[in-house]
Amino acid sequence: MITMQNVRKKYKDFELELSLEIPEGRITGFVGKNGAGKSTAIKLILGLVKPDAGKLCVLGNEGGELPAAVKQKIGVSLTESGFSSQFTVEDVWHILAKMYPDFQKDFFDKKCDVLKLPRKKKLKEFSTGMKAKLRVLTAISHKADLLILDEPTAGLDVEARNEILDLLREYIAQDEKRTILITSHISTDLESLCDDIYLIHDGKIILHEDTDVILEQYGILKVNEEQYRTLDKTAVIKVQKETYGYACFTNDRRFYQENYPQIAVEQGGIDELILMMTGGYR
């Protein structure tokens, strides 16, 4: 579905160099600190910027620029994109109907009712949650094979976030070949939705792992100086010096639970993954 092999994009003060593969039928999370390169990677995938080097393939199309037929198969929701604030949902409906031959008019209408999106109200009067729901709805309403979503639930309350996540689960359940690439700073959303996670830092992928593996096997060891000195560090990925001693990030917390019962072992989630992998040493 998406393949990037040594894809490079260089700017004056930043350079991106990525290799990743997102097969069909997967929901993949793309995480990292602000400025890590997520937005640049998305622009490359969408053909908004051209790579300086490397091989990029999206939906079978190789090269930076996407032909119209491929664009028809992609649904996009970006944080800084959207329709004119003077438009209404009815205006959006007519625009989508003209843009996409596969626009699902009845589906769009039904979901507007479910999501409580008024048809005649101008978008400038919409709440943040309503705008976010409309962005995602427009992305999934034309039978896209690939969804690319940049922070779709940012700044939303729990109810609005869950409505959007339910939309995405319904979308993926309708066709097992559909694929989603999603960025988010809300780790619980990713942990409940994604099959796997790519972590990007300073323009490079530094970790790729299945979400279940992260939640079931990763963890943080809290050790003092003496415990750290005698610790078997074979399964320690990163170490962070702290006031009391060390925090050690591991991809095999069960090993330490079984062999070092005196050590405090905490479960590692996506937040811990980002914090430890983009800091510490080793």
Mark where each language-model region is.
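ABC-family P-loop ATPase nucleotide-binding domains
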Residues: Q72, L78-R135
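A short, flexible loop at the N-terminus of ABC-type nucleotide-binding domains that lies
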Residues: M1-S19, E24-R26, P67
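ABC transporter nucleotide-binding domain
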Residues: L165-L181, H185-T250
